[in-house]
């Protein structure tokens, strides 16, 4: 096993061609090693920011099991690196850390099938791109044409995707293809700050920024004919993939609660981790 020094002085022990270890001895207080999955080529990109430092910080978390893991897509994030993975044991002081999930509540990707074939649109691609940029607000500070009242915002929190279907923005089939039919029971709108509601009021129907996207795709290969047939997928079919989240609304909710949990760092003796986005309560805290 060889050892390399990174530009930020983080020691990396090479386990094999695809795994690297940050020893728990790197920082006093680390409960486990850091384990990075990457080859030499990816490692050069990973060296470009302080994501490895975040891998080490996560290793401080109470109840963490086995190792602080980093997947090949690792890059700088909130508390955890993006691409960071950790499991905590609730019977051993395990915690819940918002930084481990990210601030963009309910961020995810949806693949939507259309009734079009590539031949239907191939001569209209430029017009399609212009139309999408014109009709779909995106980017930092973008605001949508969908205006909602304070009451409607609370309905969105409780009903989830069902609210969008009721407004004509989706179909019942969309709900059937969504986890928990688009809404997990138990949402409490009164637990959300007015500041969060203010930030979210003009952002319904917008795409956001960063790595969020709306992409028109074409099926060029099928894997598992029976499964594809059951989903109504065929070669040449046009699909739309959407990656978005809850924008400033979700960010503000998370930020509010992260700040409220700041005292937990000292309460649970996690003084070595000063990065605020790793604030946390234990799973059994009240």
Residue ranges of each PLM-predicted region?
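Single conserved hydrophobic/aromatic residue that forms the stacking wall/gate
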Residues: 277, 282-286
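Acidic, glycine-rich loop-and-beta core segments that form the ion-binding/anion-interacting portion
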Residues: 251-278
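Glycine-rich, mobile lid/loop segments that gate access to catalytic sites or pores
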Residues: 115-119, 124-249, 275
């Amino acid at each position: 096993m060889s050892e390399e020094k990174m530009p930020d002085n983080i020691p990396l022990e090479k386990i094999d061609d695809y795994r690297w270890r940050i020893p728990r001895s790197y920082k006093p207080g680390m409960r486990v090693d850091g384990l990075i999955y990457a080859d030499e080529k990816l490692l050069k990109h990973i060296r470009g920011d302080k994501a490895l430092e975040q891998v080490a910080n996560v290793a401080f978390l109470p109840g963490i099991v086995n190792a602080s893991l980093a997947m090949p897509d690792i890059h700088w994030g909130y508390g955890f690196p993006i691409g960071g993975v950790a499991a905590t044991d609730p019977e051993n002081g395990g915690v819940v850390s918002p930084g481990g999930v990210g601030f963009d509540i309910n961020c995810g990707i949806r693949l939507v099938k259309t009734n079009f074939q590539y031949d239907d649109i191939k001569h209209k691609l430029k017009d399609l791109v212009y139309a999408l940029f014109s009709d779909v607000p995106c980017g930092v500070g973008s605001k949508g044409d969908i205006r909602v009242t304070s009451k409607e915002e609370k309905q969105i929190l409780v009903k989830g995707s069902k609210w969008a279907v009721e407004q004509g923005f989706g179909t019942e089939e969309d709900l059937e293809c969504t986890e928990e039919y688009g809404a997990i029971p138990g949402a409490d709108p009164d637990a959300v700050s007015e500041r969060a509601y203010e930030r979210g009021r003009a952002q319904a129907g917008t795409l956001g920024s960063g790595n969020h996207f709306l992409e028109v795709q074409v099926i060029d290969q099928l894997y598992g004919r029976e499964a594809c047939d059951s989903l109504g997928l065929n070669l040449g079919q046009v699909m739309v993939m959407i990656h978005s989240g809850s924008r400033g609304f979700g960010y503000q909710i998370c930020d509010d609660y992260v700040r409220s949990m700041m005292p937990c760092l000292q309460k649970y003796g996690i003084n070595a981790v000063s990065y605020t986005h790793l604030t946390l309560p234990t799973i059994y805290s009240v």
